[in-house]
């Protein structure tokens, strides 16, 4: 596995109105789990570009209200799962990246391969760069740790304090 340090990068996210007052929370992802996190494991999913942010937010639900937010991530140790050799080193196949994780976990009661890979990555990284399953050619940064004593730092741009709870 090849983890690299990201010094500073910009990301985007659309927040549900329900979570707009907590833009740094990973509790929405922890509630039911996500493609790259088990239920109970907080995660922050940050699309790398605006188009991917919209596609990820809509997914199978279509257009719905949301708050568009710009994020800055710095000092993060990241594993790039867009790289085939890195994927193989954590036991993932290309098909695992877009496999239908919800039916695998919720209907079949099995562990998605992405959860097992994330378990292995947690010890050595703050997160991973992953291809978007919602937007072909798009990427997301998934963080499992942020704003702790050391490691990844995440902030968001809110000059007018619009996201205050």
Enumerate the language-model features and the residues they cover.
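Active-site and NAD+-binding cores of ADP-ribose-processing enzymes
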Residues: 1-31, 35-38, 60-165
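Extended catalytic/binding region for NAD+/ADP-ribose chemistry, centered on the ART fold
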Residues: 34-61
């Amino acid at each position: 596995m090849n983890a690299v340090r990201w010094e500073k990068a910009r990301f985007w996210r659309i927040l549900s109105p329900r979570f707009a007052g907590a833009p740094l929370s990973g509790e929405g992802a922890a509630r039911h789990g996500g493609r790259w996190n088990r239920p109970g494991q907080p995660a922050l999913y940050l699309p790398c570009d605006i188009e991917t942010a919209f596609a990820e937010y809509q997914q199978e639900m279509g257009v719905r209200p949301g708050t568009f937010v710009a994020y800055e991530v710095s000092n993060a140790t990241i594993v790039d799962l867009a790289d085939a050799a890195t994927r193989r080193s954590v036991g993932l196949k290309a098909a695992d990246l877009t496999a239908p994780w919800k039916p695998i976990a919720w209907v079949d009661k099995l562990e998605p391969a992405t959860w097992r890979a994330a378990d292995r990555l947690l010890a050595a990284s703050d997160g991973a760069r992953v291809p978007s399953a919602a937007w072909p050619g798009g990427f997301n940064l998934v963080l499992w740790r942020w704003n702790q004593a050391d490691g990844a730092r995440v902030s968001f741009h809110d000059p007018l304090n619009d996201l205050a709870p």
